[in-house]
């Protein structure tokens, strides 16, 4: 539903928002700053709900890294604040009846079951004596997947919103990567990898300067993924591209070949920068790096799973006094460096099935298309499922919630040319304030 926002409404709303931000900044310490940021973001998301995920993912990563000082809890808190602001904005839009109801997807039931299991497993973990803080940490790891799934299905409800969110994501990711690509020691690549397969798909369909621009971005992001020096990201990227090569049609393969050529050209230009050369020297180190203590850590988690294979030891389980090379004696759990070990130790086989069920269902839908936009999202899902064997990001596998949602949401638009998407965005009606909701 599109509702015109007239100028007086915008002026009054902006004045009220400014007054509220001014008031909350008077709160003591970082609480006031966080409250002001939350209110401001809520106002933005109230007008543009499709911006919740791009801002939450990239803005959360950048702002969280700046403010957390290396503390994972602070990093996660920033991301959760942005998502919470989006949730409040969405609730207000529904209350004002300017938001259309979200459609149902085949994965909704599976994601709801995962939320229910997380609640039950948290209660069970507290009942058996697991520490409340550890229960909260483990619950976050599990709940991240369905939370991002439902945020996507409730904010990206139209083709126009999906495209607008994608454009904003690529712009923010491009700015962030351009500023950081020459910084030695920067690892990651997740943000840029999320954009590469969809850009490859677009490059196979567009023509002229639009295609050249998309190829430039895709090649630039691909180089950043290569410089990430993170084997989990490399595995996810390699498997996703392989699936697109094998399953994709002519247009997809054309996009792959053109992106590969663009990546080589971009790499040649970036190699002139000393910072990029320093980062490229870390690639060999990333390949040769040993698993270190992670193997011993995973064996502890698998031992916990072997004792209680069906439902695990409850969220927040931890094994105290374990010797790990380089750490002497330490507590192991509830989060391990292998995501599946985390799942098996905390919620057992039942939890693993509930985690995989909705994701694999979306993959089945996405891989059924040879030239549709669902293919790159499904291919990325497969890549990250494989990488999760030995990778567990501290902020959770949010991509395993977002990608299935994008796969199922775009499946409804199968066969619609990208140019029609772009035309709908560029030629949408503009009201007196220039704002459309």
List PLM regions with ranges.
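N-terminal signal-anchor transmembrane segment
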Residues: 2-94, 120-124, 179-186, 384
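Hydrophobic, aromatic-rich transmembrane alpha-helices
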Residues: 35-46, 83-97, 195-206, 349-369
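Alpha-helical transmembrane segments of multi-pass inner-membrane proteins
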Residues: 38, 115, 119-124, 143-247
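Aromatic-anchored transmembrane helix interface
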Residues: 75-87, 106-121, 131-151
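Hydrophobic transmembrane alpha-helices and their immediate junctions
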Residues: 210, 346-384, 418
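A membrane-periplasm/extracellular boundary helix in multi-pass inner-membrane enzymes
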Residues: 219, 223-229, 245-286, 302-307, ...
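Long extracytoplasmic/lumenal interhelical loops at the membrane interface
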Residues: 277, 281-299, 303-307, 311-347, ...
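Transmembrane alpha-helices of multi-pass inner-membrane enzymes
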Residues: 377-388, 393-437
């Amino acid at each position: 539903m599109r509702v015109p926002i007239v100028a007086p409404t915008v002026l009054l709303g902006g004045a009220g928002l400014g007054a509220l931000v001014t008031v909350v900044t008077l709160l003591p310490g970082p609480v006031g700053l966080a409250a002001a940021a939350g209110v401001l973001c809520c106002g933005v998301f109230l007008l543009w709900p499709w911006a919740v995920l791009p801002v939450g993912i990239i803005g959360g990563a950048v702002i969280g890294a700046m403010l957390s000082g290396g503390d994972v809890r602070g990093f996660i808190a920033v991301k959760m604040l942005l998502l919470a602001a989006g949730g409040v904005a969405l609730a207000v839009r529904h209350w004002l009846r300017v938001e259309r109801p979200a459609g149902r997807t085949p994965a909704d039931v599976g994601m709801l079951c995962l939320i229910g299991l997380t609640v039950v497993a948290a209660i069970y973990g507290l009942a058996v004596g697991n520490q409340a803080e550890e229960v909260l940490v483990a619950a976050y790891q599990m709940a991240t997947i369905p939370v991002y799934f439902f945020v996507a299905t409730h904010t990206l409800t139209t083709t126009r919103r999906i495209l607008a969110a994608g454009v904003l994501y690529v712009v923010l990711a491009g700015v962030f990567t351009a500023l950081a690509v020459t910084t030695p020691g920067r690892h990651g690549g997740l943000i840029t990898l999320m954009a590469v397969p969809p850009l490859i798909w677009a490059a196979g369909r567009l023509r002229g300067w639009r295609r050249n621009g998309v190829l430039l971005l895709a090649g630039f992001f691909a180089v950043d993924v290569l410089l990430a020096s993170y084997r989990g990201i490399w595995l996810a990227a390699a498997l996703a591209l392989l699936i697109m090569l094998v399953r994709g049609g002519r247009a997809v393969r054309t996009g792959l070949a053109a992106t590969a050529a663009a990546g080589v050209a971009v790499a040649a230009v970036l190699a002139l920068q000393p910072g990029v050369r320093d980062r490229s020297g870390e690639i060999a180190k990333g390949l040769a790096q040993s698993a270190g203590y992670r193997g011993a850590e995973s064996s502890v988690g698998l031992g916990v799973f072997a004792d209680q294979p069906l439902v695990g030891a409850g969220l927040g389980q931890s094994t105290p006094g374990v010797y790990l090379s380089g750490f002497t004696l330490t507590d192991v759990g509830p989060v391990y460096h292998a995501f599946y070990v985390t799942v098996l130790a905390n919620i057992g086989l039942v939890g693993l099935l509930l985690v995989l069920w909705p994701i694999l269902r979306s993959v089945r839908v996405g891989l059924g298309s040879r030239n549709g936009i669902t293919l790159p999202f499904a291919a990325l899902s497969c890549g990250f499922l494989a990488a999760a064997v030995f990778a567990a990001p501290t902020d959770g596998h949010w991509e395993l919630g977002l990608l299935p949602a994008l796969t199922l949401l775009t499946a409804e638009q199968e066969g619609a040319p990208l140019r029609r998407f772009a035309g709908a965005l560029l030629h949408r009606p503009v009201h007196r304030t220039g704002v459309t909701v």
